[in-house]
Regions:
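Short, intrinsically disordered terminal segments enriched in charged and Pro/Gly residues
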Residues: 103-128
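Short cysteine-rich clusters marking metal-coordination/redox-active sites
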Residues: 73-76, 90-93
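Cys/His-rich microdomains that often coordinate metals
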Residues: 80-81, 94-97
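Short nucleic-acid-contacting surface segments enriched for D/E, G, S/T with interspersed K/R
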Residues: 37-50
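OB-fold/S1-family single-stranded nucleic acid-binding modules
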Residues: 54-69
Length: 128
């Protein structure tokens, strides 16, 4: 998922099957229950999720591939199981999701290099 974002479910109406997810950027995006990736068609308010944003009906932005209990790697963008900023390891690039390094991009911590350097190095590997 290249445009993966993180957020939390702000509201969900089981009867109608519609909900809102608040993205990390502060915007609220609507979604339909068929976009919940575990197939349950229901989700609790407050659940941390990853999702992608696509143009939906009538040109409105909609959340798709709403995935509960996951986090988006700040280095490579891949979606991983687990909680965000809980020192989980990315299965794609090996980044340890350190909350301090997420806030202070040039700091080292759980990872030997900073988030800024890791992103630069990851982009360089893709360019080859």
């Amino acid at each position: 998922m290249t445009n993966a974002q993180e957020g939390r479910v702000a509201s969900f109406d089981d009867f109608v099957g519609l909900g809102l997810v608040d993205g990390a950027d502060g915007q609220s995006i609507g979604f339909h229950c068929t976009q919940i990736s575990d197939g349950s068609r229901t989700i609790a308010v407050g659940t941390p999720v990853t999702f992608a944003v696509v143009a939906g009906h009538l040109g409105r932005w909609e959340a798709t591939r709403v995935r509960p209990g996951s986090w988006c790697c700040p280095v490579c963008g891949s979606v991983n199981d687990g909680r965000p900023r809980a020192y989980e390891i990315c299965t794609t690039c090996g980044w340890e999701d350190d909350p301090v390094q997420f806030e202070y991009l040039d700091a080292t911590g759980a990872n030997r290099e900073s988030l800024t350097a890791a992103r630069r190095d990851w982009a360089a590997t893709l360019a080859v």
